[in-house]
């Protein structure tokens, strides 16, 4: 203290606490004023003073001194309640995962902070001399944060990656931690069990790699002679004075500095504190300094480009190993801070916002023009203030004004009533914590399987134009519509089509059948079906076998030969619907093993489901026309007028279409039974040709004849055909052309044995053999078939109670399958006559096709199959029926029918089974979806377990509507309708009927003719969204009309239409907990599928909220599996205040990995530069200059990135250390494959200067481009293979070096250490015998004064040294 005493008159006495920062400043000023010797003497005295005071105080620390804060319990309870509420909001889809994490962190951080702030007053009041209290503010050991962990709560911890663990440690160290809290604490704490080893090794490995890259960099020369420099300017305000000073001190000027005409500093002068202060004072022009980047050599560095040595304030000495110093300077802070004994233990530190609260109850008023709506970072709605906003709170007798600063959130609305102490605004935390912010990505993963939907527009990310990455422009929900996905590994599986009905669980059980990709599709199909339909399954759980499937979906096989003969009249069927036909198919019978439609109708639908006009839709095989035995057909025909000009059966785009040349009327026709046996050639036949046998004669070893008669044997194509003609044989004297039918009562009257025939007979003339001339006559019995009336197929269809225009119709057509008048049929089961349904619609319509699809509905075990046919959509004009009112809103301006845009398929069942609310959970609809793997097709099975019904809402009040309850006898089978997705939802509306009323209270029911309908059936009032997203409405009656464009209810009045807002609209996504009825919120989120008067049916869905800028992975409608990445958020988060959170960042920058939200653009920038420069300068110089400019640009960017990380952690590292490292990782270029050169192979990494020199020597362009190497890759691409081998991959490096015959010139330190030589630094450094002559430098310097650009170009292109 004597020194201070000596200069007392000039000193000011400071009476304040000196903390660590003040002590640093004090020591710094001592060194400046008195030098190092005096300073150390003074500090010794300060140390002694401190020890004496501490001894006198004799403070000790016992466990009883740790006093827990009393208010902790209820503060923690409050935080837990907020967390539970937050979890609910996230589940409802009100906040997304990042907002939830952020808010959770801030809830606990605020709780922790309140506790910390309460700690000091608590100690001050209860025990002011508590040793813990005294120590925590002494600045010597420990701080408030650590004491808070002892007596408050440990709070939130960060894991080794710096991510926050959102489970807080609620205990403090005095109370002790639970097991979970201890493990979290181990992860987060700097001294934790887990952390210490990890961090030390990380920092050590980083140092090792850094040293490896630059170990050969030694100061070899005094001056390399460069004229280039990097300009530094404080003028633009981008650089703080502190950073500006730090950048300049210790550097060497690359050019003279002038103020006006006066030179205040010369080239090659090193910069000290005085010179820097002069620059700042005079605000000199941009200052050009020399840096390691501007040094001309890549393998060493010169004194002037390096500058002053950090150890002693003088130019660095020759032979100094500056590379190793640089590597250790960057790696060391990580190691040092990892091993620090005193730390807050990884506890999260961040800023919270200040709240403005209302001082009393009152009404809020502010200018709404100065705010705009937004979301807070917690997902709450708020107003953002763009500038100072004055908010007035008015009570009865008090008016209070509050000024809200800009960038703050206003949490209340204008004219809202607020209570005392209610938070009305949130002022963002000051910018002090901004340097602890970083941008990170957060991936959200799907926790359920299903189909992806979103309800907003999305943009393609520019770099992924054809990918499945989409950017959200605004806040919206992503929905996962639930359903069980099933993925086939074999590519398109042809047995399932979109909208097929399936058993939902059977596929998942049998997945293993479709796992081997080597088997063919047919094998799989066979296995697939044999596994399902072998009869092991319970009845009712099966789907048709393969042949039946072919019949149902008509794979092209058709049983029609010549369908040329039509039955007389073509009746129109009873069932006519506007643009659609619904055909229900009967359920399978008990014990039967085949799926048949009602009455044996076979439906033939092409695979693509598209039917043309006059297509055969279905055929019916009447059992009366089925013969179990083989035989021949015979009939006589009469030609009628031709009905269609086209000829015969035409196959048009895979659809069989009836276009017969003429129509024949047949009445009656005949079947002649003949027994036929088809035998193998090797069979031993026991009867002879032309022999006559009796009934039950042995024909072969294992066959007997069923009838007696004439035997004929024919050989055909390795088969033997054995035919037995029953009947009598006659040998008439005179044979005419005896091929004729004799009706009953016929015969020769003059014959002796004349008797009246009872049955039809067929007379056939035959020869015994081909060569004989003699004939005999075979008289055979005949089975006659009379023309019957077409079966009444009308009973297939429900009665059409809804009056509609007749657009789509079916015709019944009978025809004989076998057109040839005498045709042998050798099948054992023959259908002689087939009844067809032919699809037709009005000729004046321009529609060319109709779409058909199968629907299978199951209700409590009862299966109903339906075929649905819709005409393709087209703007059909709608003519109003006579009951339509003029203002009904059905006819739009352009005259097109609004209802036609969404044709509804109403599906009805007359089954008497009681339908309950419980649904069969195992039946579902297959929905074919897009899969990320292009080769395989994904199916999603939507079963009724994924749907739920909400309602009935009997208390919903519609204006102007009176409800009449119609009591029905519940035992009467009700007319019900089956819903979508194969579920048996009873979508009927049982006891509500709406009358419409005009203003004068006159019932308009009579006008609408609803009274009669009431007696017949219950009007269905519901709307349906099918699996394809089309909206259907049953157009049941005119009392409630859906406008598909606005999706609002319309209530119809006598002369005007009043629109009332809808409660829910079709296809709308509802979040959980949304109130849609008075009963309270509904309990599931999902999409509205069916809209009824009293209830809605929704398909379960899981909402995920996403904010603008989020990246959505996947396409609309794509299947997502559990655990798939759904969306990626990019958000800012507060960083833990430890250096090593930054260490991985440093490593990422130096290893040139992507760290930004949008990947690090340096490499893209490099490609862009190369292209532009080549275009501007042409080939020869373009590569060199392009690479050079790119490298300069990326070097500065990399240095700034590394410095930003370290500065944010409060660590000071001189730029030159980072520059030496960055110079090494940016000094190589990659030889490209644009043009082959004789010197370097494509893909080879070479130094930029070497490439340029080689190109100049060869006088040809070498194509290359700049690359950014990471430090690891740079270490493996040096001139020394010994150095590379000692780093990693030793065997590979040595083997490659041996093969290439590489030479190591032992220029670096490491290779000399390995071989035991003297290292070329320090005393082992050989000074060059003579400094090279400086003429080029002088010339270049003069040139630069004349023309700066010319000098720089010459420097780049010509002046280089090895």
Swiss-Prot record:
<dbReference type="InterPro" id="IPR050254">
    <property type="entry name" value="RNA_pol_beta''_euk"/>
</dbReference>
<feature type="binding site">
    <location>
        <position position="224"/>
    </location>
    <ligand>
        <name>Zn(2+)</name>
    </ligand>
</feature>
<dbReference type="GO" id="GO:0008270">
    <property type="term" value="F:zinc ion binding"/>
</dbReference>
<keyword id="KW-0150">Chloroplast</keyword>
<feature type="binding site">
    <location>
        <position position="305"/>
    </location>
    <ligand>
        <name>Zn(2+)</name>
    </ligand>
</feature>
<keyword id="KW-0808">Transferase</keyword>
<feature type="binding site">
    <location>
        <position position="302"/>
    </location>
    <ligand>
        <name>Zn(2+)</name>
    </ligand>
</feature>
<dbReference type="Pfam" id="PF05000">
    <property type="entry name" value="RNA_pol_Rpb1_4"/>
</dbReference>
<protein>
    <recommendedName>
        <fullName>DNA-directed RNA polymerase subunit beta''</fullName>
        <ecNumber>2.7.7.6</ecNumber>
    </recommendedName>
</protein>
<keyword id="KW-0479">Metal-binding</keyword>
<keyword id="KW-0548">Nucleotidyltransferase</keyword>
<dbReference type="Pfam" id="PF04998">
    <property type="entry name" value="RNA_pol_Rpb1_5"/>
</dbReference>
<dbReference type="InterPro" id="IPR012756">
    <property type="entry name" value="DNA-dir_RpoC2_beta_pp"/>
</dbReference>
<dbReference type="InterPro" id="IPR042102">
    <property type="entry name" value="RNA_pol_Rpb1_3_sf"/>
</dbReference>
<comment type="similarity">
    <text>Belongs to the RNA polymerase beta' chain family. RpoC2 subfamily.</text>
</comment>
<keyword id="KW-0804">Transcription</keyword>
<keyword id="KW-0240">DNA-directed RNA polymerase</keyword>
<dbReference type="InterPro" id="IPR038120">
    <property type="entry name" value="Rpb1_funnel_sf"/>
</dbReference>
<dbReference type="GO" id="GO:0009507">
    <property type="term" value="C:chloroplast"/>
</dbReference>
<dbReference type="InterPro" id="IPR007081">
    <property type="entry name" value="RNA_pol_Rpb1_5"/>
</dbReference>
<dbReference type="GO" id="GO:0000428">
    <property type="term" value="C:DNA-directed RNA polymerase complex"/>
</dbReference>
<comment type="subunit">
    <text>In plastids the minimal PEP RNA polymerase catalytic core is composed of four subunits: alpha, beta, beta', and beta''. When a (nuclear-encoded) sigma factor is associated with the core the holoenzyme is formed, which can initiate transcription.</text>
</comment>
<keyword id="KW-0934">Plastid</keyword>
<comment type="function">
    <text>DNA-dependent RNA polymerase catalyzes the transcription of DNA into RNA using the four ribonucleoside triphosphates as substrates.</text>
</comment>
<dbReference type="GO" id="GO:0003899">
    <property type="term" value="F:DNA-directed RNA polymerase activity"/>
</dbReference>
<dbReference type="GO" id="GO:0006351">
    <property type="term" value="P:DNA-templated transcription"/>
</dbReference>
<dbReference type="GO" id="GO:0005739">
    <property type="term" value="C:mitochondrion"/>
</dbReference>
<keyword id="KW-0862">Zinc</keyword>
<feature type="binding site">
    <location>
        <position position="295"/>
    </location>
    <ligand>
        <name>Zn(2+)</name>
    </ligand>
</feature>
<dbReference type="GO" id="GO:0003677">
    <property type="term" value="F:DNA binding"/>
</dbReference>
<dbReference type="InterPro" id="IPR007083">
    <property type="entry name" value="RNA_pol_Rpb1_4"/>
</dbReference>
């Amino acid at each position: 203290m004597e020194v201070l005493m000596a200069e007392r008159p000039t000193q000011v006495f400071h009476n304040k606490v000196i903390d660590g920062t003040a002590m640093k400043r004090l020591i710094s000023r001592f060194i400046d004023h008195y030098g190092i010797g005096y300073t150390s003497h003074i500090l010794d005295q300060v140390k002694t003073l401190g020890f004496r005071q501490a001894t006198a105080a004799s403070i000790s620390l016992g466990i009883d001194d740790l006093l827990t804060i009393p208010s902790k319990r209820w503060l923690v309870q409050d935080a837990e309640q907020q967390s539970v509420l937050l979890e609910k909001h996230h589940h409802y889809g009100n906040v997304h995962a990042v907002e939830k994490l952020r808010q959770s962190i801030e809830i606990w951080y605020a709780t922790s902070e309140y506790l910390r702030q309460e700690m000091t007053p608590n100690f001050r009041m209860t025990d002011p001399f508590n040793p813990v209290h005294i120590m925590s503010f002494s600045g010597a050991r420990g701080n408030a944060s650590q004491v808070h962990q002892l007596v408050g709560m440990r709070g939130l911890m960060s894991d080794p990656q710096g991510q926050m663990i959102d489970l807080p440690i609620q205990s403090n160290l005095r109370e002790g931690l639970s097991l979970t809290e201890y493990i979290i604490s181990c992860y987060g704490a700097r001294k934790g069990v887990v952390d210490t080893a990890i961090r030390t090794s990380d920092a050590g490995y980083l140092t090792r790699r850094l040293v490896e890259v630059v170990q050969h960099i030694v100061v070899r020369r005094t001056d390399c002679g460069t004229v280039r420099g990097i300009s530094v300017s404080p003028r633009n305000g981008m650089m703080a004075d502190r950073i500006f000073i730090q950048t300049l001190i210790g550097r060497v000027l690359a050019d003279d500095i002038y103020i006006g005409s006066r030179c205040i500093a010369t080239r090659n002068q090193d910069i000290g504190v005085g010179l820097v202060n002069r620059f700042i004072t005079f605000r000199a022009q941009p200052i050009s300094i020399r840096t390691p980047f501007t040094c001309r050599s890549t393998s060493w560095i010169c004194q002037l480009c390096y500058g002053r040595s950090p150890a002693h304030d003088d130019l660095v000495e020759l032979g100094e190993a500056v590379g190793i110093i640089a590597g250790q300077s960057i790696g060391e802070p990580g190691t040092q801070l990892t091993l620090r004994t005193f730390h807050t233990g990884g506890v999260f530190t961040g800023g919270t916002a200040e709240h403005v609260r209302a001082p009393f109850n009152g009404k809020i008023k502010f200018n709404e023009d100065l705010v705009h709506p937004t979301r807070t970072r917690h997902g709450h709605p708020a107003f953002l203030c763009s500038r100072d906003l004055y908010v007035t709170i008015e009570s009865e007798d008090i008016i209070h004004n509050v000024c809200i600063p800009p960038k703050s959130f206003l949490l209340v609305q204008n004219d809202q009533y607020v209570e005392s102490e209610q938070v009305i605004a949130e002022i963002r935390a000051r910018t002090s914590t901004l340097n602890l912010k970083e941008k990170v990505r957060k991936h959200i993963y799907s926790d359920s399987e299903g189909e992806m939907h979103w309800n907003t527009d999305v943009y393609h990310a520019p770099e992924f134009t054809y990918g499945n990455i989409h950017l959200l422009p605004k806040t919206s929900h992503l929905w996962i519509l639930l359903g069980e996905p099933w993925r086939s590994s074999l590519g398109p599986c042809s047995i399932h089509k979109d909208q097929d009905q399936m058993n939902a669980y059977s596929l998942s059980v049998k997945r293993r059948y479709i796992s081997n990709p080597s088997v063919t599709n047919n094998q799989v199909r066979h296995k697939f079906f044999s596994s399902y339909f072998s009869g092991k399954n319970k009845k009712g759980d099966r789907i048709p076998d393969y042949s039946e499937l072919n019949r149902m979906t008509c794979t092209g096989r058709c049983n029609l030969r010549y369908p040329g003969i039509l039955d007389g009249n073509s009746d129109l069927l009873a069932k006519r619907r506007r643009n659609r036909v619904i055909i229900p198919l009967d359920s399978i019978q008990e014990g039967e093993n085949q799926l048949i439609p009602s009455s044996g109708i076979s439906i033939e639908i092409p695979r693509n489901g598209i039917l043309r006009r006059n297509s055969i839709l279905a055929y019916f095989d009447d059992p009366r026309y089925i013969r179990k035995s083989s035989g021949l057909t015979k009939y006589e025909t009469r030609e009628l007028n031709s009905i269609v000009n086209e000829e015969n059966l035409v196959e048009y785009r895979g659809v069989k279409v009836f276009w017969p040349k003429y129509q024949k009327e047949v009445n009656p026709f005949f079947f002649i039974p003949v027994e036929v046996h088809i035998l193998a050639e090797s069979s031993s036949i026991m009867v002879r040709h032309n022999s006559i046998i009796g009934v039950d004669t042995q024909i072969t070893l294992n066959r007997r004849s069923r009838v007696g008669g004439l035997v004929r044997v024919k050989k055909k194509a390795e088969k033997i055909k054995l035919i037995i003609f029953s009947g009598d044989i006659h040998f008439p004297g005179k044979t005419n052309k005896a091929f004729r039918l004799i009706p009953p009562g016929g015969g020769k009257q003059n014959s002796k044995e004349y008797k009246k025939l009872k049955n039809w007979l067929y007379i056939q003339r035959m020869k015994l053999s081909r060569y004989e001339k003699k004939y005999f006559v075979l008289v055979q019995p005949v089975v006659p078939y009379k023309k019957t009336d077409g079966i009444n197929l009308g009973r297939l269809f429900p009665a059409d109670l809804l009056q509609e225009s007749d657009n789509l119709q079916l015709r019944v057509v009978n025809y004989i399958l076998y057109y040839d008048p005498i045709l042998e049929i050798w099948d054992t089961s023959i259908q002689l006559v087939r009844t067809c349904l032919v699809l037709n619609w009005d000729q004046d319509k321009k529609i060319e096709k109709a779409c058909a699809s199968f629907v299978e509905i199951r209700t409590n075990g009862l299966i109903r199959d339906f075929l649905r046919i819709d005409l393709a959509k087209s703007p059909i004009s709608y003519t109003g029926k006579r009951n339509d009112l003029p203002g009904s809103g059905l006819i739009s301006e352009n005259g097109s029918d609004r209802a036609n845009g969404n044709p509804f398929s109403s599906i009805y069942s007359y089954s008497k089974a009681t339908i309950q609310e419980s649904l069969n959970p195992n039946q579902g609809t297959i929905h074919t979806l897009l899969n990320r793997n292009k080769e395989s097709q994904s199916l999603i099975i939507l079963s009724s377990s994924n749907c739920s019904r909400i309602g009935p809402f009997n208390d919903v009040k519609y204006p102007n509507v009176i409800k009449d309850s119609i009591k029905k006898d519940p035992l009467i089978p009700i007319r019900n309708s089956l819903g979508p997705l194969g579920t048996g939802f009873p979508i009927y509306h049982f006891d509500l009927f709406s009358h419409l009323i005009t203003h004068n209270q006159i019932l308009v029911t009579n006008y609408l003719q609803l009274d009669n309908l009431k007696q017949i059936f219950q009007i269905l009032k519901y709307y349906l969204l099918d699996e394809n997203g089309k909206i259907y409405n049953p157009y049941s009656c005119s009392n409630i009309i859906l406008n598909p464009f606005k999706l609002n209810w319309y209530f119809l009045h006598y002369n005007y239409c009043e629109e009332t807002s809808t409660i829910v609209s079709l296809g709308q996504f509802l979040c959980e907990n949304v109130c849609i009825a008075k009963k309270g919120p509904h309990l599931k989120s999902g999409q509205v599928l069916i809209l009824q008067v009293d209830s809605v049916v929704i398909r379960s869905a899981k909402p995920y909220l996403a904010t603008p800028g989020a990246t959505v992975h996947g396409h609309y409608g794509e299947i997502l599996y559990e655990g798939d990445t759904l969306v990626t958020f990019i958000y800012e988060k507060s960083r833990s205040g430890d250096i090593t959170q930054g260490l991985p960042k440093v490593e990422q920058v130096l290893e040139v990995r992507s760290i930004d939200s949008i990947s690090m653009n340096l490499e893209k920038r490099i490609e862009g530069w190369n292209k532009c420069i080549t275009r501007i300068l042409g080939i020869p110089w373009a590569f060199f200059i392009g690479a050079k400019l790119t490298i300069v640009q990326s070097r500065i960017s990399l240095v700034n990135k590394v410095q930003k990380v370290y500065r944010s952690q409060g660590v000071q590292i001189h730029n030159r250390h980072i520059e030496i490292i960055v110079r090494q990782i940016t000094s190589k270029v990659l030889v490209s494959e644009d043009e082959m050169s004789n010197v370097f192979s494509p893909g080879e990494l070479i130094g930029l200067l070497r490439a340029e020199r080689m190109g100049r020597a060869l006088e040809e362009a070498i194509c290359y481009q700049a690359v950014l190497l990471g430090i690891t890759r740079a270490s493996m691409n040096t001139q020394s293979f010994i150095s590379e081998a000692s780093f990693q991959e030793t065997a590979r490096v040595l083997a490659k070096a041996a093969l290439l015959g590489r030479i190591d010139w032992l220029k670096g330190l490491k290779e000399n250490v390995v071989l035991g030589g003297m290292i070329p630094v320090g005393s082992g450094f050989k000074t060059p015998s003579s400094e090279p002559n400086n003429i080029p430098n002088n010339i270049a310097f003069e040139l630069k004064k004349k023309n700066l650009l010319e000098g720089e170009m010459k420097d780049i292109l010509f002046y280089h040294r090895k």
